[in-house]
Swiss-Prot record:
Region of interest called Inter-domain linker, as start-end residue ranges on this chain: 332-345
UniProt lineage: Bacteria, Pseudomonadati, Pseudomonadota, Alphaproteobacteria, Hyphomicrobiales
GO BP terms in the entry: phosphorelay signal transduction system; regulation of DNA-templated transcription
Protein's recorded name: C4-dicarboxylate transport transcriptional regulatory protein DctD
GO molecular function list: ATP binding; ATP hydrolysis activity; sequence-specific DNA binding
Role noted for this protein: Member of the two-component regulatory system DctB/DctD involved in the transport of C4-dicarboxylates. When activated by DctB acts in conjunction with sigma-54 to activate the transcription of dctA.
Listed Pfam families: HTH_8, Response_reg, Sigma54_activat
Modifications the protein undergoes after translation, according to the UniProt entry: Phosphorylated by DctB.
InterPro entries the record matches: AAA+_ATPase, CheY-like_superfamily, Homeodomain-like_sf, HTH_Fis, P-loop_NTPase, Sig_transdc_resp-reg_receiver, Sigma_54_int, Sigma_54_int_dom_ATP-bd_1
Domain of life (superkingdom): Bacteria
Disulfide cross-links: none
The organism of origin for this protein: Rhizobium leguminosarum
Keyword Signal: no
Length: 448
């Protein structure tokens, strides 16, 4: 059964209070009714999850004083005023001061219910976004899971339902869509939050190194093993292990990883000692591991072991209504970081936000917002410098090519492998073009 939406009702008229409470309860609300403002203020928490409906004319503390006090507690708390005909001018002023709505007595039940329903939805979104921002801050993550589109609502609901379980999770999504953010949130919202969150990009390490990184090794296990090393899996025991780009994991390592998932134990290199581990594994892939034609050498049994729960993150182009909200958040954060004011949006920036396909997804949008705040004209693709009069076609193509490379580097956080993949050119060609255009790829990475 769904949880009833809470509403606080304050009215000193016993009969009207009872009738109003009954109307709201029949409409599916959970009503906390009070006979005065003092009782309500003593009982209501600052983060009350629903709207407040109050009469204006009450002894001791009237509805307008109550509204002002509640605004001081939480400026986003929706307050609906019930008012007699003579109080309408005061109610209008309260609306201008931030009250959610006023309803003139006598009122139809539907009028009250619809107003409370809209206010409840607004309150739910406000509290939900606060929770997500806090989760992102706690995780020290630069790409929070922000959005109000239905697909993001559904994603958050899934995360809430599974976060506090120990089920292993497979996260699917394009580059820059926020897969590690999802993993961080699963960790922060779980009972493992006090344990370590350990991340490893399987595509960033050569086959000769990845086993030692994951499982650890004893001194002398191989040439160069001067001392004992604790692996990422053991370090994550008690917390969460995040394996990004798991589709890049070597076949031999996949076999060992399957045993970790099944037995929750490891055997470090150079020893026969079996060590138990207690961890949750969140794996991420940018390809469809469920498609045999796509997954290639990735083991089917490992896929099915990870596929207890699969979370798909939609690309930014499929939730375009979230772009203004995300851009606003990233611009505000960049302004604080760079000690700049958020500039007004120019027509070029508005056009770019509306028309760009965002192949780098949320990460690309974040970098674009930073460039806008820094005053780079237009912030990106819209900011290509005017071509000098009389520039030849080859000169224009050279400038355009350089801009595409810069944008792709930015969208991929300076990661060479992902940038080459996105551009579809050989590695040597890529480095030749960097040198020819004088582009320093190090300047495009947000990692310090």
């Amino acid at each position: 059964m769904d949880t009833l939406m809470p509403v606080a009702l304050i009215d000193d008229d016993k009969d009207l209070r009872r009738a109003t409470a009954q109307t709201l309860e029949l409409a599916g609300f959970s009503v906390s009714a009070y006979d005065g403002a003092k009782a309500a203020l003593a009982d209501l928490p600052a983060d009350f999850a629903g709207p407040v409906v109050t009469d204006i004319r009450m002894p001791e503390i009237d509805g307008l004083q109550l509204f002002a006090t509640l605004q001081g507690m939480d400026v986003d708390l929706p307050v609906i005023l019930m008012t007699g005909h003579g109080d309408i001018p005061m109610a209008v002023q309260a609306i201008q001061d931030g009250a959610y709505d006023f309803i003139a007595k006598p009122f139809a039940a539907d009028r009250l219910v619809q107003s409370v329903r809209r206010a409840s939805e607004k309150r739910r979104l406000v509290l939900e976004n606060r929770m997500l921002r806090k989760a992102a801050e706690d995780a020290q993550e630069n790409l929070p899971l922000i959005g109000q589109t239905p697909v993001m609502e559904n994603l958050r609901n899934i995360l809430r339902h599974i976060a506090d379980t120990d089920v292993d999770v497979l996260v699917a999504g394009e580059t820059g869509s926020g897969k590690e953010v999802v993993a961080q949130i699963l960790h922060q919202w779980s009972h493992r939050r006090k344990g370590n969150f350990v991340a490893l990009n399987c595509g960033a390490l050569p086959e000769t190194v990845i086993e030692s990184e994951l499982f650890g090794h004893e001194r002398g296990a191989f040439t160069g093993a001067q001392k004992r090393r604790t692996g990422r899996i053991e370090h994550a025991s008690g917390g969460t292990l995040f394996l990004d780009e798991i589709e890049s994991m070597p076949a031999a390592t996949q076999v060992k990883m399957l045993r970790v998932l099944e037995m929750r134990e490891i055997t470090p290199l150079g020893t026969n000692e079996v060590r138990p581990v207690n961890l949750r594994v969140v794996a991420a892939a940018k390809i469809d591991l469920g498609d045999p034609a796509v997954r290639g050498d990735f083991r089917e049994d490992l896929y099915y072991r990870l596929n207890v729960v699969t979370i798909s993150i939609p690309p930014l182009r499929e939730r375009r209504d979230d772009i203004p909200l995300l851009f606003s958040h990233f611009a505000a954060r960049a302004a604080e970081r760079f000690r700049r004011d958020v500039p007004p949006l120019s027509p070029d920036v508005r056009r770019h936000l509306a028309s760009h396909t965002w192949p780098g997804n949320v990460r690309e949008l974040s970098h674009y917002a930073e460039r806008v705040v820094l005053g780079v004209e237009g912030g990106g693709a819209a900011a290509v410098p005017p071509q000098p009069t009389g520039a030849t076609l080859p000169e224009r193509l050279e400038r355009y090519e350089a801009e595409i490379i810069r944008d792709t580097l930015s969208a991929n956080d300076g990661d060479v492998r992902r940038t080459i993949e996105a551009l579809g050119i050989p590695r040597k060609t890529f480095y030749d073009k960097l040198q020819r255009h004088g582009i320093n790829r190090g300047g495009y990475s947000s990692r310090k």
